[in-house]
């Protein structure tokens, strides 16, 4: 018997998540992972590495609580937002329970559920990428955790708050509703943060990977009521954050770090507006989808041809052609103006 045959049956059936980095490429313009295009500069202030780190570093918890305008007991810090997804499934799903998500959306909801042996249900978004509440309500039987993303990855739009509140109303007492706000800094007024006190089954995922320009740090957060946070504390690893990670995260959450983040957001929004203006002039562009994030989803006449043409020129975009309902679509992360100018030139020739 082979080693792979000794693995769990559900693991044998899995396909590894195709992250932007896993897909590879030899490009010099990377616009496929929704990262900030340049790195902030930090110096380590904590240099004691022979001791285990704090399970939940106080400076990071208090810093993020102050930034998000919640209490420290409403916050748990994780190894990126992806660990938050996994913890929520681990903490709340029995083997017979199900996870529901709404494609096209972030792929890790399905991957995490399948890895943990939890079945999934899907209720596709509507044609304008909003929640299909009647269909969701029909499919709630057996569902313990629901993942929604706003701004949604890869479409870029925000979900209607009235729909999110309705979703919370119809799931009270039966399921956890998780709103993934990884990109919320680009549309802060649409956050569900003010609803935490009204809905004890609401959890919000946040990250330092996007607007804070710290994707390499792997630092994320779950915001929720203290009882829900307490459940996650039971299933999280004992020492999730390495000392250098918590050191840099705490610095990034200081007032100066938050101010720098807001400057980055302004830069991204300006470059996004410029890119959209240029895309409108390209004949092969069929549709530019409205976006409130640091990327733009674009439908082309022949998306695969365009993607491959830019790949060969060292410009790496994110092919969404196989995603649900996104045939011929490509997601373009907002890079520097120089990177976007090079991309536009290549798109015109593709």
UniProtKB/Swiss-Prot annotation:
It comes from the Bacteria. Pathway: Amino-acid biosynthesis; L-histidine biosynthesis; L-histidine from 5-phospho-alpha-D-ribose 1-diphosphate: step 7/9. Keywords: Amino-acid biosynthesis, Aminotransferase, Histidine biosynthesis, Pyridoxal phosphate, Transferase. One of its GO terms (biological process) is L-histidine biosynthetic process. Pfam families: Aminotran_1_2. It is an enzyme of class 2 (transferase). InterPro entries: Aminotrans_II_pyridoxalP_BS (IPR001917), Aminotransferase_I/II_large (IPR004839), HisP_aminotrans (IPR005861), PyrdxlP-dep_Trfase (IPR015424), PyrdxlP-dep_Trfase_major (IPR015421), PyrdxlP-dep_Trfase_small (IPR015422). GO terms for molecular function: histidinol-phosphate transaminase activity; pyridoxal phosphate binding. The keyword Transit peptide does not apply. PROSITE patterns: AA_TRANSFER_CLASS_2. The modification N6-(pyridoxal phosphate)lysine is found at residue 210. The keyword Membrane does not apply. Its cofactor is pyridoxal 5'-phosphate. Its EC number is 2.6.1.9. It catalyses: L-histidinol phosphate + 2-oxoglutarate = 3-(imidazol-4-yl)-2-oxopropyl phosphate + L-glutamate. Gene3D superfamilies: Aspartate Aminotransferase, domain 1, Type I PLP-dependent aspartate aminotransferase-like (Major domain). Belongs to the class-II pyridoxal-phosphate-dependent aminotransferase family. Histidinol-phosphate aminotransferase subfamily. NCBIfam families: hisC. Homodimer. This is Histidinol-phosphate aminotransferase 2. The lineage of its organism: Bacteria, Pseudomonadati, Pseudomonadota, Gammaproteobacteria, Pasteurellales.
């Amino acid at each position: 018997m082979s080693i792979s045959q000794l693995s769990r049956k559900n693991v044998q059936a899995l396909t590894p998540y195709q992250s932007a980095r896993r897909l590879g490429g030899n490009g010099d313009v990377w616009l496929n992972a929704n990262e900030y295009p340049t790195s902030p500069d930090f110096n380590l202030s904590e240099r004691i590495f022979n001791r285990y780190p704090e399970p939940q570093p106080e400076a990071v918890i208090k810093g993020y609580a102050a930034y998000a305008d919640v209490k420290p007991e409403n916050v748990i810090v994780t190894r990126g937002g992806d660990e938050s997804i996994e913890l929520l499934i681990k903490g709340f799903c029995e083997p017979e329970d199900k996870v529901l998500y709404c494609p096209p959306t972030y792929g890790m909801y399905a991957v995490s559920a399948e890895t943990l042996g939890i079945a999934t249900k899907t209720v596709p978004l509507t044609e304008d990428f909003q929640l299909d509440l009647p269909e969701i309500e029909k499919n709630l039987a057996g569902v313990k955790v629901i993942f929604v993303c706003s701004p949604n990855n890869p479409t870029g739009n925000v979900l209607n708050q009235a729909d999110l509140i309705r979703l919370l109303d119809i799931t009270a007492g039966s399921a956890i509703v998780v709103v993934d706000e990884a990109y919320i800094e680009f549309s802060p007024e649409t956050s569900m943060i003010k609803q935490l006190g009204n809905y004890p089954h609401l959890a919000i995922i946040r990250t330092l990977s996007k607007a804070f320009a710290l994707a390499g740090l792997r630092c994320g957060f779950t915001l929720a009521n203290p009882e829900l946070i307490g459940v996650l504390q039971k299933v999280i690893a004992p020492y999730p954050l390495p000392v250098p990670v918590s050191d840099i995260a705490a610095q990034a959450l200081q007032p100066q770090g938050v101010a720098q983040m807001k400057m980055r957001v302004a830069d991204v929004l300006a470059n996004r507006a410029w890119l959209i203006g240029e895309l409108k002039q390209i004949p092969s562009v069929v549709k530019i989808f409205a976006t409130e994030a640091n990327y733009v989803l674009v439908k082309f006449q022949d998306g695969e041809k365009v993607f491959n043409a830019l790949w060969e020129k060292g410009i790496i975009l994110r092919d969404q052609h196989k995603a649900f309902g996104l045939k011929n679509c490509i997601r373009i992360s907002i890079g520097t103006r120089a990177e976007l100018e090079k991309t536009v030139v290549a798109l015109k020739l593709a």
